[in-house]
């Protein structure tokens, strides 16, 4: 019995041990899983200030969340106002960014869940391996009996585990009650939101009604405004039409005034003087009548003389006033008849044009004076034929003047043409004479040079025939010339009171050296030097020619000035001219000094 009891107790202990181990493993696994879940909840809900992990966070307040979202939207709106264009984001880009962030978070959560599932599978696999290993080890082995202390220890552990389970159940119940309370609170908040939505809908309805009324009132006001604008437009068109008619009438009035001035200018002076006298007489009579009227008003009833004068003046004034209005109507009728029938408006236009303007007329009779005097203004031309006669006379005068002017122009053109031809001929002759003078001067200078050379040669050939003084002078001049050549060719460094012959020998040696060097110089450099010398010679000749031309121009100007200042000699009668003789045929003679001229040119070319 004892053996059986011990076997049973040992079996129970082993079972209890296995159960305890399984509970420990499950508790350990649950303990490992709980921190992960708590960490996950803490990640989802945020940090909890209290130490109790089963306490609800403050983020559950939906009203607070709504306020936070509203403040966040306001801050984002203010930030959008301050941001630049390239820094702003559209709604689609924001939504895409949110979607990408949510997708990334979901991917991370999926990865974490996969890792957790893998770890749990690894734990289960290890536990299964451990149980199988334990069964294989304990199989067919005698299990040693355990003592009471181990058994009590196991029971204590079981009790503690049961206690923890009860605590967790109570905490779960408490959390469920809190969840029900929060759900009730949320339902109440939903009801308040529904009430707020109903109030907001009512406000929107009232706002729509007020906006409809405002739109109707605005439409009425716009209709009234459009009607007023149309009325104003009609009135403005009428004003513009009236102004255009006024301007048209003013233009016609100006035309008539121009015609009137023209007719007054064509009228004779005697008639104008008569009209001026008549106007002055009427003006004086009017002044006398006004003065007599004033005297009759101020006089007593017994005074008959002044009263009679006042009556006469009043009758005169009435007649003037009576003739004033008909004249105005007559003028208007004439203008209308001129506008209606232009083909019959020659005489009426003349009369109305002559009567429409008097301010710019050459006589003192004006339109205001005629209106004030009450009499119709008169014109000298009563028939168109009179005006045509005046036109014919003026046309004849103009034709005669035009003919005289044409004759004068023809004579002037002939004179200018002859003057031009004579000027051209004189200029040509002057240029020819100048060329002849220049050629003669050049030939004279050449002849003088050749004569001087011949004279020098003759003196040299006839050296013994001259006297000693002349020879000394000639030798001295020759010495000076040789010295000048020596200084120009060799310089003043080697000059030490040399004689003429010595200087000539030195010049000859220098010339030989130069000729030898010249033979050694390449042909290209010689050609360049020749070109340079030729260019200098041409420039010098051009300058001399320009100087000669300037001198000739000055002489010509002096002669012209003297000719202009001299007295004009009037030729009387024909000039005596001798008979013309046939021209003499001159034979051209070749100059004997061409060789000498060539030598001079070579000397000038190479030694200047």
Swiss-Prot record:
May play a role in ciliary/flagellar motility by regulating the assembly and the activity of axonemal inner dynein arm. This is Cilia- and flagella-associated protein 100. Residues 1-57, 291-320, 339-377 are annotated as: Disordered. The gene is CFAP100. InterPro entries: CFAP_domain-containing, DUF4200. One of its GO terms (cellular component) is axonemal doublet microtubule. Keywords: Cell projection, Cilium, Coiled coil, Cytoplasm, Cytoskeleton. Residues 164-196, 230-257, 385-435, 500-575 form a coiled coil. The keyword Coiled coil applies. Residues 1-17 have a biased composition (Polar residues). It is found in: Cytoplasm, Cytoskeleton, Cilium axoneme. One of its GO terms (biological process) is inner dynein arm assembly. It comes from the Eukaryota. It holds the Pfam family DUF4200. One of its GO terms (molecular function) is dynein complex binding. Residues 20-32, 339-361 have a biased composition (Low complexity). The keyword Cytoplasm applies. Belongs to the CFAP100 family. It comes from Macaca fascicularis (Crab-eating macaque).
